[in-house]
């Protein structure tokens, strides 16, 4: 076999071992080279049998980088100091609201009074937590407090002295003269009066049909039945 290079002066013992070939072992012919079947398809890349270990280590490094808010710097005199990575906003004063039996009090520097100061409610003090996460119990208390405030305001407002049923009856100002039934609009009353008078002013537009209806929507619905039969 023709070799492009001369291996006569090559020290075989100094050559690195290849997979399946132990540094040629002084063999000069290709026919004497034998590769084991087990190592025939092996690659030079390492096998990651513990891939989850590598993945966990990578996650740890990423989390450490993401939540590390300081970095180390050197000053002019050679001393090392830690400085924040991100811009830190000033610590704003949180506003706490306390509900008692008398009034609603706001703990803030502002001297303005809210319109809700006249409302009353029985509840505990609601403050914003330090971590910004509101628990389910605190959320339910806030929701119940808002609902009770709204209900109490509706009850104390003189304009909302009527109940829902009384309010609906008040809005039904169009009364039928025959059956004394009330309606909220004059159109509904006129449509209802056709039941007593028997008026059927809407004729079916289909040729040959003599059906008449008191309501326009019923007439159109009947007309569509003719169109479906003709298809």
UniProtKB/Swiss-Prot annotation:
- What subcellular compartments does it reside in? Nucleus
Functionally, this protein is described as follows:
Transcriptional repressor involved in regulation of glucose repression. Binds to UAS-1 in the STA1 promoter.
Q: Out of the domains of life, which is the source? A: Eukaryota
Quote additional remarks: Present with 556 molecules/cell in log phase SD medium.
List GO BP terms, alphabetically. Answer: cell adhesion involved in single-species biofilm formation; cellular hyperosmotic salinity response; negative regulation of invasive growth in response to glucose limitation; negative regulation of pseudohyphal growth; negative regulation of transcription by RNA polymerase II; regulation of transcription by RNA polymerase II; single-species surface biofilm formation
Entries under InterPro entries matching the protein = Znf_C2H2_sf (IPR036236), Znf_C2H2_type (IPR013087)
Question: What keywords tag this UniProt record?
Answer: DNA-binding, Metal-binding, Nucleus, Phosphoprotein, Repeat, Repressor, Transcription, Transcription regulation, Zinc, Zinc-finger
Give the UniProt entry's GO cellular component terms. Answer: chromatin; nucleus; transcription regulator complex
Q: What PANTHER family would the database entry show?
A: TRANSCRIPTIONAL REPRESSOR PROTEIN YY, YY2 TRANSCRIPTION FACTOR
**Which residues are recorded as modified (Phosphoserine)?**
163
Q: What Gene Ontology molecular-function terms does this entry list?
A: DNA-binding transcription factor activity, RNA polymerase II-specific; DNA-binding transcription repressor activity, RNA polymerase II-specific; RNA polymerase II cis-regulatory region sequence-specific DNA binding; RNA polymerase II-specific DNA-binding transcription factor binding; zinc ion binding
Q: Where are the zinc fingers (C2H2-type)?
A: 174-196, 202-226
- What species was this sequence derived from? Saccharomyces cerevisiae (strain ATCC 204508 / S288c)
**Which named protein is this?**
Transcriptional regulator NRG1
UniProt keyword DNA-binding present: yes
Q: Does the keyword ATP-binding apply?
A: no
């Amino acid at each position: 076999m023709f070799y492009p290079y001369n291996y006569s002066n090559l020290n075989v013992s100094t050559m690195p071992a290849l997979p399946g070939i132990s540094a040629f072992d002084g063999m000069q012919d290709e026919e004497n080279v034998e590769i084991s079947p087990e190592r025939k398809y092996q690659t030079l890349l390492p096998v990651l049998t513990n891939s989850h270990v590598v993945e966990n280590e990578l996650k740890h490094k990423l989390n450490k980088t993401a939540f590390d808010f300081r970095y180390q710097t050197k000053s002019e005199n050679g001393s090392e100091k830690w400085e924040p990575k991100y811009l830190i906003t000033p610590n704003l004063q949180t506003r706490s609201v306390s509900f008692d039996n008398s009034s609603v009090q706001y703990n803030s520097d502002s001297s303005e009074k809210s319109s809700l100061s006249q409302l009353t409610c029985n509840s505990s003090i609601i403050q914003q937590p330090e971590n910004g996460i509101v628990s389910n119990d605190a959320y339910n208390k806030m929701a119940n407090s808002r609902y009770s405030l709204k209900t109490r305001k509706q009850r104390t407002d003189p304009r909302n002295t009527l109940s829902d049923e009384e309010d609906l009856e008040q809005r039904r100002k169009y009364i039928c003269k025959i059956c004394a039934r009330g309606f909220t609009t004059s159109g509904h009353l006129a449509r209802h009066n056709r039941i007593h008078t028997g008026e059927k002013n809407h004729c079916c537009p289909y040729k040959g049909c003599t059906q008449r209806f008191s309501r326009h929507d019923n007439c159109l619905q009947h007309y569509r039945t003719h169109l479906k039969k003709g298809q």
